[in-house]
Amino acid sequence: MSIFGVFTEHEVEVSDNIKISQIEHEPWPMPTLKRYNYFMKEADHISKYDYCFYFDVDMGLVAKVGDEVLSDLVATMHPYLSFAPKEQRSYDRNPKSLAYVGFGEEGENYYAGGFNGGSTKEFLKMSEVIANRVTKELKHDIIPLWHDESHMNRYLIDNPPTLSLTPSYCFAEEQMGNPNYPYEPKIIALKKNHNELRN
């Protein structure tokens, strides 16, 4: 049985397979930066299950996602940045940050923050490391370039995923209908108004 966990500051309807976790309203970028902290607050509940996957609320499932995504540590190649030269990928280059990636130590892929997971043990292990790093940095007013995604990419360089999913699982909506884009969509990263969401 699959259980869906929803982290929200709003009141929402619940059902037997949905668990609601209330979070406080905070200004951008805290809701995304602190997502791994939210996961750790629910670690006791999450640990009841064999696998745990996270995906952004603005993702749309348009095809079957099945056992092919099951592995210990799963990450999804970024629909754009994975194909850029390593030195041009937008890792956090601030040496004061725990998400820092120096030139020459980039990973094989750059991963999107929108869909990741794996065995519950490995997912919570990653979540704990990232949550601790975020908490430590916030005490010094340090926020990485791409927030939780920057921390995740640093972690995945040090702990490579056992499965790298193609951009089919974080398919940029603006690529729909593009005959030159070599992937079929399974999970779509929907277009959004960034200014509206962050204000």
Regions found by a protein language model. Name each.
Residues 1-9, 53, 75:
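Short, hydrophobic beta-strand segments that form beta-sheet elements in well-ordered domains
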Residues 5-13, 57-64, 169-170:
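Short, polar loop motifs at secondary-structure junctions
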Residues 5-6, 52-56, 117, 163-166:
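A structural signal for short, well-ordered beta-strand segments and their strand-loop junctions
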Residues 7-50:
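Active-site-proximal specificity loops/subdomain of glycosyltransferases
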Residues 32, 36, 57-59, 145-150:
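Conserved glycosyltransferase catalytic-site signature
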Residues 36-86:
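GT-A fold catalytic core of metal-dependent nucleotide-sugar glycosyltransferases
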Residues 68-122, 129-130, 149:
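PAPS-dependent sulfotransferase catalytic domain
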Residues 105-193:
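Catalytic core and acceptor-binding pocket of nucleotide-sugar-dependent glycosyltransferases
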